[in-house]
Amino acid sequence: MRIVILAGGISPERDVSLKSGRRLADHLSEVGIESEIREPDELLIDYLATTKPDLVWSVLHGAGGEDGAVQRLLEMLGVAFVGAGSRNAKNTWNKAAAKAKIAQAGLATPDWISLPKNTFKQLNAKSVLGLVSNDLNFPLITKPVEGGSAQGVSRSDDQKGLGKSMVEAYAYGEEVIIEHFIQGTELAITIIDTGEGLKALPAVEIEAESGNFGYQERYVPGETTFYAPARLNGNIAQAAADMALEAHRELGLGVFGRVDLIVDENNKPWFLEASVSPGLTETSLSPQAFVAAGYSLGEAYKAIAESAISYQSRQ
């Protein structure tokens, strides 16, 4: 088996992507799988068309990597790849579209509104802030509709703070999503298919020292404490896993994805967002879930790769 790993790119998450790519290549090598890390450059399409790898595994993060564009090109090339197809990737990358689909399926997700920058400006920012504040109720979480690694994400507890949060989020995109903040236990649940159907790995519980699982808390060792498996009793853990599985299916994330939830003080799980290209760095969430499930990382990645190739052959 020969795998091309797509990593790098030009998004703000480039460094994280490169780290994920190197870690993935190292672990594949441990189980005897040949891989090559490639950047998404002007030579890539011709290279893939000529060399015809068995599989492409994209760990590209951000626009161009998770928004369905690369996935659509791979579909056109007829190359097997890990993760969601182009349409589902696009709809998951857009947090508002993903939440709408999840809500339509009857799954709980915090109340929200998405606002393009132009709408915010044209309709009088102060009036918009007042309306949103009254309708959604503080505290609120504001984040770019399209983006990852918690960049541009912040919490606000009053209208003045909401205005600052929106300015910060708009720095990362032309549309933001504002949702009601739910106090509880934050979880990341990795979903995989290793040839025996989809299954949820043990939830990883996230406890950030700052109280906010932002970019620094995600990638700087020591900023966040992770518990894998999460410190939940069996029934609550199962309810969270069931929701994550259903969300993964509704969004069509393929053989590998991650669903982020929060379990509130009444033990009810709420969908927050999902990732079509989970990070694989030393501090990333999915590798911790694999280890908690008893996998070696090399064997886990090998099984996902084989499942992705098998899935593609059945399409």
Question: Where are the language model's segments positioned?
Answer:
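ATP-binding N-terminal substructure of ATP-dependent carboxylate-amine bond-forming enzymes
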Residues: 1-97, 116-128, 306-315
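Short beta-strand-to-turn element immediately C-terminal to the catalytic PLP-Schiff-base lysine
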Residues: 115, 153-158, 191-194, 263-264, ...
